[in-house]
Swiss-Prot record:
UniProt name for this protein: DNA-directed RNA polymerase subunit alpha
Family under the similarity heading: Belongs to the RNA polymerase alpha chain family.
Gene Ontology BP annotations: DNA-templated transcription
Catalytic activity of the protein: RNA(n) + a ribonucleoside 5'-triphosphate = RNA(n+1) + diphosphate
UniProt keyword terms in alphabetical order: DNA-directed RNA polymerase, Nucleotidyltransferase, Transcription, Transferase
Key word Lipid biosynthesis present: no
Ranges for region Alpha C-terminal domain (alpha-CTD): 247-335
Subunit text: Homodimer. The RNAP catalytic core consists of 2 alpha, 1 beta, 1 beta' and 1 omega subunit. When a sigma factor is associated with the core the holoenzyme is formed, which can initiate transcription.
InterPro entries per the UniProt record, alphabetical: DNA-dir_RNA_pol_insert, DNA-dir_RNA_pol_RpoA/D/Rpb3, DNA-dir_RpoA, RBP11-like, RNAP_asu_C, RNApol_insert_sf
One Pfam assignment: RNA_pol_L
Listed Gene3D superfamilies: 5' to 3' exonuclease, C-terminal subdomain, DNA-directed RNA polymerase, insert domain, RNA polymerase, RBP11-like subunit
Role description: DNA-dependent RNA polymerase catalyzes the transcription of DNA into RNA using the four ribonucleoside triphosphates as substrates.
GO cellular component: cytoplasm; DNA-directed RNA polymerase complex
Organism phylogeny: Bacteria, Pseudomonadati, Pseudomonadota, Gammaproteobacteria, Moraxellales
Length: 335
């Protein structure tokens, strides 16, 4: 195959292989060498950060004033109950927010199926466990669900200095409908050319959006963002940009850079958490199991991460990166 210097191959086919109802592999080929990583990284970042979704942002529980309370007859404490509510997969139709209610008498499990929903709200994981009641237990609560994008801390919803209402428990919201996404670039061949790329995107959603539709939305967002460059005037000087690394540099920094309290920092080091990339992969539940790390320290860690655009429970592909050698870890550990 012969080609001119200005000729670029464009993908001839896109293939979607459904793995389950919520996960799929998307295969795109052939691509010019290097375009697999270019497109794969851009789509992955958009999928994780920019697709709209819904999440529980506020909870009112009868008889409970704050998240550190307990409810008689409820097996879980309120913090664990709130964490379980974050696992609800909710779809809102033609609205930005909605209110759900729940009333239950024990004994038995409280699941998402027990929620009373408005006509324009759907919970796609009705079997999701929220809590467990004993024979003498009962619960009555109201949930506020909002639409959004990315990750939003509860503090960001209140202007500085504004007092939060007592009894209305605020939750950090992860709106993204994407649970997991990664990509690989394999070799592809067209006739005699073997220096081509094949892009394979592997993704899993929370069920509120079809994997194929998620890819379509991400590609549309990318197209809209770069369309302006097509009409770029010739007399406009191009702006040089430094290439971005696969791994965000902030993830390679030691946790000491977060300037946590001595107690929090020592608890993390005791769990072999030396780098910010190590920390963001831990969940709230995992950190609460750390000896001497209480809910106050957890709140401090979450707030510091949020100020840097990070959160707990992130999934990082290929961590630790090759640039973070084992001897670097040993050197840091010996400080």
């Amino acid at each position: 195959m012969t080609r001119t210097a200005n000729e670029f191959l464009t993908p001839q086919a896109i293939k979607v292989e459904a793995v389950s109802g919520t996960s799929a592999k998307v295969i795109l080929e052939p691509l010019e060498r290097g375009f697999g990583h270019t497109l794969g990284n851009a789509l992955r970042r958009i999928l994780l950060s920019s697709l709209p979704g819904a999440a529980v942002v506020e909870v009112e529980i009868e008889g409970v004033e704050h998240e550190y309370s307990t409810l008689e007859g409820l097996q879980q404490d309120i913090v664990e109950l709130l964490l379980n509510l974050k696992g609800l997969s909710i779809k809102l139709f033609d609205q930005n927010e909605a209110y759900l209610t729940l009333e239950k008498q024990g004994p038995g499990d409280i699941t998402a199926a027990d929620l009373r929903l408005p006509h324009n709200v759907e919970v796609v994981n009705p079997e999701h466990l929220i809590g467990t009641l004993s024979a003498s237990g009962s619960i009555k609560m109201r949930l506020k669900v909002s639409q959004g994008r990315g990750y939003e801390t509860s503090d960001s919803r209140f202007p500085e200095g504004e007092t939060r209402p007592v009894g209305r428990l605020q939750l950090d919201a992860s709106y993204s409908p994407i649970k997991r996404v990664s990509y690989t670039v394999e070799n592809a061949r067209v006739e005699q050319r073997t220096d081509l790329d094949k892009l394979v995107i592997d993704l899993e959603t929370n069920g509120t959006v079809d994997p194929e539709e998620a890819i379509r939305k991400a590609a549309t967002i990318l197209q809209q963002q770069i369309a302006i460059f097509v009409d770029l005037q010739k007399d406009q000087a191009p702006v040089a940009q430094e290439p971005r690394e696969e791994v965000d540099p902030i993830l390679l920094r030691p946790v000491d850079d977060l300037e946590l309290t001595v107690r929090s920092a020592n608890c993390l080091k005791a769990e072999n958490i030396y780098y910010i990339g190590d920390l963001v992969q831990r969940t709230e539940v995992e950190l609460l199991k750390t000896p001497n790390l209480g809910k106050k320290s957890l709140t401090e860690i979450k707030d510091v991460l949020a100020s840097k655009g990070l959160q707990l429970g992130m999934r990082l592909e290929n961590w630790p990166p090759a640039s973070l050698r084992m001897d670097d870890r040993f050197a840091y550990r010996s400080r």
